[in-house]
Amino acid sequence: MATSQIAIIVLLGLLVATNIHITEAQIGVCYGMMGNNLPSHSEVIQLYKSRNIRRLRLYDPNHGALNALRGSNIEVILGLPNVDVKHISSGMEHARWWVQKNVRDFWPHVKIKYIAVGNEISPVTGTSNLAPFQVPALVNIYKAIGEAGLGNDIKVSTSVDMTLIGNSYPPSQGSFRNDVRWFTDPIVGFLRDTRAPLLVNIYPYFSYSGNPGQISLPYALFTAPNVVVQDGSRQYRNLFDAMLDSVYAAMDRTGGGSVGIVVSESGWPSAGAFGATHENAQTYLRNLIQHAKEGSPRKPGPIETYIFAMFDENNKNPELEKHFGMFSPNKQPKYNLNFGVSERVWDITNSTASSLTSEI
């Protein structure tokens, strides 16, 4: 075989390997709709596709958005809103109806990957009244998904925040608060038994803005030049990893060492509060996208991560919540971000690879 032909084969192998790596580390983006000036659902999904964003989180089963997603090949976290959790927990008939109307009617044309039953429900926040219904709702939706024949395709989980963590420093000593163990232990057990990941919302911004005297901005933005936290043999240069690994440690302590984590939200506001600037937000998002390929000291490897959020949403409060978007409502990007090789480039690569192969 000629040297040039060998070189072409090696090149093709590298292209395939690169494509796989990009897919594994692909970042998703949360599609919030709390704005009165946002683009149509079809425009939004087209924007996802044009920017090579292949994963999306929906906070409720908006049928306009789900219809726009048909045939897009975008993977979806589909939210079951907090307002429906108690109702779903009360009987299988409600869970079956919800799954039929919001999942089965769209599958497989919409690639629903996870169902997030509730968002940030916690016994120690304003959602405490829903906490007793969380696990029954999870179980009912899980059973309904199984009855619909989708148990091997769609995982059922819930999205939590860091308020459930009692100790997070050092990360290896992470643990759930004692007063929420009645809530977290059954969730971790459910996820372990069903082999589903825990969805976790991780925001270094809020930790930094609440404790700027103890947490440095570079540590929060992935830009610290040196190790900030030495935890045994593990070294931490960024707060994101430390927060993530503290949750892994907490689950390990409750029998959930085999449970994976999906970072279901992470972002940085560009205005509206302390430390919320365009420069900081761009730095954080750029570095988060890159870091998702690498993993944490405790769990190396790609981290499935969803950026919050696609758009600035002017109906949210307080003020900083209006400024988490990567795009303005007119679809103009606020930052220069790269989500990997564009679909157009990969089309060119694939056609070139095909023609090269035919010549060997």
From Swiss-Prot:
It is an enzyme of class 3 (hydrolase). It comes from Solanum lycopersicum. Glycans are attached at residue 350. Gene3D superfamilies: Glycosidases (3.20.20.80). GO terms for cellular component: vacuole. Belongs to the glycosyl hydrolase 17 family. Implicated in the defense of plants against pathogens. Pfam families: Glyco_hydro_17. This is Glucan endo-1,3-beta-glucosidase B. Coiled coil: none annotated. The modification Pyrrolidone carboxylic acid is found at residue 26. One of its GO terms (biological process) is carbohydrate metabolic process. InterPro entries: Glyco_hydro_17, Glyco_hydro_17_plant, Glycoside_hydrolase_SF. Induction: Upon infection by virulent and avirulent races of pathogens, for example fungal pathogen C.fulvum. Its main location: other. PANTHER family: GLUCAN ENDO-1,3-BETA-GLUCOSIDASE BG1-RELATED-RELATED. It comes from the Eukaryota. Residues 341-360 form a propeptide. Disulfide bonds: none annotated. The active site is at 120 (proton donor), 265 (nucleophile). Its EC number is 3.2.1.39. Residues 1-25 form the signal peptide. GO terms for molecular function: glucan endo-1,3-beta-D-glucosidase activity.
